[in-house]
Amino acid sequence: MIDICLAAPHHIEALVALDSVAQHAPERAAQIQAWVQAGTCHVLLVDGRAAAYGVLHHQFFNCGFIEMLMVGPGYRRQGLARQLVEHLRAQCARPKLFTSTNRSNTAMHALLVQAGFQRSGYIDNLDEGDPEWVFFCPVSGG
């Protein structure tokens, strides 16, 4: 059974464990804790176990922005990221929703296009040699 809810402090350890970056970057673990405490982190549970998380805030030019989307390695390629994106879009309290990903992340590009996003621009100089592509999706009722 799949359930998506706002992450709570008791989820933090599991979110850090599924995050491939947090395994070697303590600052990511601290960021996960901050997102949970801020009430912007949503966790996707499969049979009660944390499988993925996403972070949605509304501080990107007063628009919704999916800041992070992470699926645990053992749960990838099962459609969970798409379900999480759709959940975050439904939670967006603004008429515009944005997100971004590196140019090299072709799997995320495909997911976003399938979820109704369109490319909206790019940002150079975040990751050397791998621009950040920005994507946009209108939100009905936002």
Where is each model-derived feature located?
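Acetyl-CoA-dependent GNAT
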Residues: I2, L6-M68, G72, V85, ...
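Conserved acetyl-CoA-binding loop-helix of GNAT-fold acetyltransferases
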Residues: V71, R77-A90, A110, Q114
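Short Asp/Glu-rich motifs
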Residues: A38, M108, P131-E132
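A short, internal acetyl-CoA/4′-phosphopantetheine-binding micro-motif in the GNAT/acyltransferase core
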Residues: L69-R76, T101-R103
